[in-house]
């Protein structure tokens, strides 16, 4: 065992004070650390201010900042004062002499230990709770602004007859104040009790009285305040019943009072309020009675009442009054919920029409002509053909198209054309060498719009481009083609300085440019450069010679994040889409105002409701929600973002929305009136997809208007899974120009199908007029199918396509030669009482792996066709040819080459392709297989010959990449060599349609 004696254990080491030099060094390091942290915080604040000022929305920054600071200091100070005063008061009320007991003797050591630091300890505790409370309060800036600026809805709830604004704007703020009050009371009570215990005012094990009179009175007042706040909570809970959600009839977010709420919970809350008030008064009376006997009894009775009256009694009412006769008891409350929910989601005007689902028309020619007149069927699926755009129009590896393209309308010769559109955006992953200069100075922007007809493809299965090539040319005339702001521009760029930017490349080589716009933040100031160097953790910004006079930094460059930043009170639609408006590329962003405080309106979860097979594979299409659970939504704002200047403009769209009016009061001047929207922009506005997805989900239950049907659950629908893939995710809605049975002409519409809950047959077809500027824009039409007849739904139709023997054999052949078959959007069109289904079939051929339109599947009235073109398929299905003038299919001849070897191979490929088409018509599968092999051999020879020619000429020339280099309509999908491997254009710089820098 070690020696525990008192002998010497070795020399003692005395630790003296550090030398002056060490103290100076430590102090210097400490000061530098503090200054460094201060500058980091300053850099974040300063760069935010500079950005908001650059986009001319500085009022948004100052309003939100001042509100946050005000809430932080007010509530932080209130909490600090509440806790500090009670600690001080408990110390002031301490007994002059503590009892002589072991407990008090133990506490003496602590009292003596903290005596020299009492003031600092008090300051530290109050500062800590104040900081926490202030930070929590500052996060409620939206709640505060809505309460201060709230405008009435001019609609009253059916139970308490209060304006909806009370629930949407007032009640959330009152609940925050109540929560803050509870926190202050509890913290003060704990702090006071600990202080009383430390200084002898409270005793746990000592003999005699457990508390002094002063401690008893002090703690009784705090307990009385707590119970009084509980009384206020009971009173507010009465109104909270109108916005309370519950699981009712498999509707997890059913909102509003039910029978048990109105007849059990509501009177129970009133009774508990009265009991809590009496109990609070008993605690306050302790100041005079100096005993806790009555208040403790009262508090116990309050807890017992909460269990019996607030819990057991409603359960008894539900069990013995409601459940035996549920429909009769709940019907009046369900009617209130139906009405409020339909109003809150804007579906109260939905028109439901009975639709037979089967045509009685026997005139085949009429049916065939009606098919052309009813819809302009979009064969080009924007969610499939992005790789085709990429292959044919990428031009350079540092350009890319989005995963999902967009659908818009453009007029030509006075007629609207559904158009699939995408922007050739910057792709930093494709630049020759990644370094700081290349990533942020040289490669700064995309270039040009690429657009194609949505209703047709050329004879080779490729898109019929209406705008293409680099620089772009086509139907859109002159416009600013440079894209500095887009969905793929997620990194910052520094432009306008001495470093030139890569503009585009053509046959004559690379073109350079320098940004002439006014957006971005000027980096001429050393302070600005230092702030951004810290904010972006890029020290090069501070000292790089590539930054000079006129240099500007562009960031926050995606359309959605720019709109979200300038309007942080808006929920942003997941799909921003581009349009050429007034010679500029404008990103159009739909934005919503929401609340979850609309009485009796059932809630929905935006993230779940707007999810489908597209968002599952592309999270950039997910909605940007300010609050995920809502029970009121309006598409109140249409926003635009200029792709060149980055300018953000907010336009009022729903002029009656009280939530928008509230935010306009809070941020005056940020939203322009609806009348300021130019006609050229209105032509491209459309009904937003995310709002439509929310509405269709609600309409699966709320298409019924009577309570009995709702309660029976006999007409519950569901959104079907996407039949074109096996992901199990919901089918997305589709845009196409069509007319419903009660419409006289085609309109740009957003459509979807609905099936019975748990089954695959069709229940309803739903569409909304998506064409802004028309009289019935936003009108929802629902065609309800009869329950007495089974009408095939999308999944069943897809299954029929896959199981029909002739089609299955053709699909098997299309998959030959290392090709992949991909189904496009399965479109549904109501036609003469029946339903026409159309699905394009794409083939990704060989090693090129980009889809080309090969076949069209059509079914109507039990007849199915699988043909090369839509017209052929419709003719076969209806057994009659159209008597109307067919649209221009944009057929192009196979391209030629100046290289004799390549041209010879292309001629052989064309012959093989023609032979294969003839073999398919017979059908002669053996001959088709031989022609397929000959075609692949010929294309391989053409590709090899072209590669040799490019190598011999230094790779500076290539064919027109918009057309390819071979007859790419082979059923295997084999195609020309990749345009991206030889991306130069056949146009001179003079073909640049850009009107110049603006």
From Swiss-Prot:
> Signal peptide position in this chain?
none
- Point to the regions of Low complexity compositional bias: 966-998
Q: Which residues cross the membrane?
A: 25-47, 69-91, 120-137, 176-198, 219-236, 266-288, 295-317
Ranges of biased composition (kind: Polar residues):
893-902
The cellular location(s) given in this protein's UniProt record come to: Cell membrane
Q: Which domain of life is it from?
A: Bacteria
Per the record, the major location class is: membrane
Keyword Transmembrane: yes or no? yes
- Cite a GO CC annotation: plasma membrane
A Pfam family annotated for this chain is UPF0182
Alphabetically ordered keywords of this record: Cell membrane, Membrane, Transmembrane, Transmembrane helix
Q: How does it sit in the membrane?
A: Multi-pass membrane protein
Biased-composition ranges for Basic and acidic residues?
A: 939-951
The coiled-coil segments of this chain are: none
Q: Which InterPro entries match?
A: UPF0182 (IPR005372)
* Homology family: Belongs to the UPF0182 family.
Could you tell me which PANTHER family the record lists for this protein? UPF0182 PROTEIN SLL1060 (PTHR39344:SF1)
Q: What is this protein called?
A: UPF0182 protein SAV_3055
Q: Which organism is it from?
A: Streptomyces avermitilis (strain ATCC 31267 / DSM 46492 / JCM 5070 / NBRC 14893 / NCIMB 12804 / NRRL 8165 / MA-4680)
**Source organism lineage?**
Bacteria, Bacillati, Actinomycetota, Actinomycetes, Kitasatosporales
